[in-house]
Amino acid sequence: MTSPVPRLIEQFERGLDAPICLTWELTYACNLACVHCLSSSGKRDPGELSTRQCKDIIDELERMQVFYVNIGGGEPTVRPDFWELVDYATAHHVGVKFSTNGVRITPEVATRLAATDYVDVQISLDGATAEVNDAIRGTGSFDMAVRALQNLAAAGFAGVKISVVITRRNVAQLDEFATLASRYGATLRITRLRPSGRGTDVWADLHPTADQQVQLYDWLVSKGERVLTGDSFFHLAPLGQSGALAGLNMCGAGRVVCLIDPVGDVYACPFAIHDHFLAGNVLSDGGFQNVWKNSSLFRELREPQSAGACGSCGHYDSCRGGCMAAKFFTGLPLDGPDPECVQGHSEPALARERHLPRPRADHSRGRRVSKPVPLTLSMRPPKRPCNESPV
């Protein structure tokens, strides 16, 4: 019997009538200043979509039969109409998964969430201890996230996720993350560090080493059966047998995934917020559905893609050349190997002088930190301690 998987992949590559995974950043306002923030969040954009405009988008998603939307930011819960929009979405058959640092997940909010259908909550943690996490996310952010997990567990909220960006500093804590998730009845989700947003400045110091990539792969194969990874780690697939890692081994940008930002701009990928990947705007280009179906960028991405320099590699069918955003923001050709290619094929290009594209906009608060990263820490310190007033 022929496996349906290749046919499904072919459909994904040609693009679907609606995205499977739609990320919507409701606001750039944030109470934290994480060093790797992919959207360089901090300050609210004055052109942020209004409540009415957001509801119009939700109406459109309902007509397109979008299953659910990933809501992020920034910190989405600081937007005054956040809960109104969540209620509106679920009432219009659009499920919501939102990512939060936990700042607004009080016992009362947790109780409300536990009584709500079609809402999924994801708490961001980048260290299994305060020492590791707070060096990335800011002083007090670990305790804040754990407090949110405690509140959700006490309220009986089922299915909370702990979302971890894997870095050089926390890859050794994988077992501890799993223990933490078990303690609060949570599912562990791990994602890849991308060199986008503020991550552009710290990627070289924070992305896992080659040995750590192998360590991560081995852990996922042996212990990661119930760990969510999405499409984060298909670049690791050549380390083992085909199919050993769960997840989608293709770039879904503009085919099955995309992003709407706070002002209504639509990008091909949540990790590629740059003019090069801007497909249109929901306000000025006839709505989201028109952008999704008719954008010239999305049409181009849905055409058969050349394997380029990776075509002669025997592992191409496993990794498909890796992550488009990771290549773009490290100044590598889009038809070449991933900067973290486990076969080492990107090393010659990384050794050469490259132009590193800058993010489209920086919403950070205060002056950017540009001094060299201390080698003893292998990272840039957070810009400021946790502050619950983001606006």
UniProtKB/Swiss-Prot annotation:
Comp. bias (Basic and acidic residues): 350-364
Residue numbers binding [4Fe-4S] cluster 1: 30, 34, 37
Pfam families, A to Z: Radical_SAM (PF04055), SPASM (PF13186)
The EC number(s) this enzyme carries: 4.1.99.26, 1.3.98.7
Residues in Radical SAM core domain copies: 16-232
Cofactor dependence: [4Fe-4S] cluster
GO MF entries: 4 iron, 4 sulfur cluster binding; lyase activity; metal ion binding; oxidoreductase activity
Entry superkingdom: Bacteria
UniProt entry keywords in alphabetical sequence: 4Fe-4S, Iron, Iron-sulfur, Lyase, Metal-binding, Oxidoreductase, S-adenosyl-L-methionine
Binding-site residues, [4Fe-4S] cluster 2: 251, 258, 269, 323
Residues the entry annotates as binding [4Fe-4S] cluster 3: 310, 313, 319, 341
Record's cofactor remark: Binds 3 [4Fe-4S] clusters. One cluster is coordinated with 3 cysteines and an exchangeable S-adenosyl-L-methionine. All three [Fe-S] clusters are required for MftC modification of MftA.
PROSITE patterns: RADICAL_SAM
Positions of the UniProt region annotated as Disordered: 340-391
A Gene Ontology term for the protein's cellular component: plasma membrane
The reaction(s) this protein catalyses: [mycofactocin precursor peptide]-C-terminal glycyl-L-valyl-L-tyrosine + S-adenosyl-L-methionine = [mycofactocin precursor peptide]-C-terminal glycyl-N-{[2-(4-hydroxyphenyl)ethenyl]-3-methylbutanamide} + 5'-deoxyadenosine + L-methionine + CO2; [mycofactocin precursor peptide]-C-terminal glycyl-N-{[2-(4-hydroxyphenyl)ethenyl]-3-methylbutanamide} + AH2 + S-adenosyl-L-methionine = [mycofactocin precursor peptide]-C-terminal glycyl-N-{5-[(4-hydroxyphenyl)methyl]-4,4-dimethyl-2-oxopyrrolidin-3-yl}acetamide + 5'-deoxyadenosine + L-methionine + A + H(+)
Family: Belongs to the radical SAM superfamily. MftC family.
NCBIfam families, per database record: mycofact_rSAM, rSAM_more_4Fe4S
Purpose: Radical S-adenosylmethionine (SAM) enzyme responsible for the first step of the biosynthesis of the enzyme cofactor mycofactocin (MFT). Catalyzes two reactions at the C-terminus of the mycofactocin precursor (the MftA peptide). The first one is the oxidative decarboxylation of the C-terminal L-tyrosine of MftA, forming an unsaturated tyramine moiety. The second reaction is the cross-linking of the tyramine with the penultimate L-valine residue, forming a five-membered lactam ring. Its activity requires the presence of the MftB chaperone.
Protein name: Mycofactocin maturase MftC
Species whose genome carries this gene: Mycobacterium tuberculosis (strain ATCC 25618 / H37Rv)
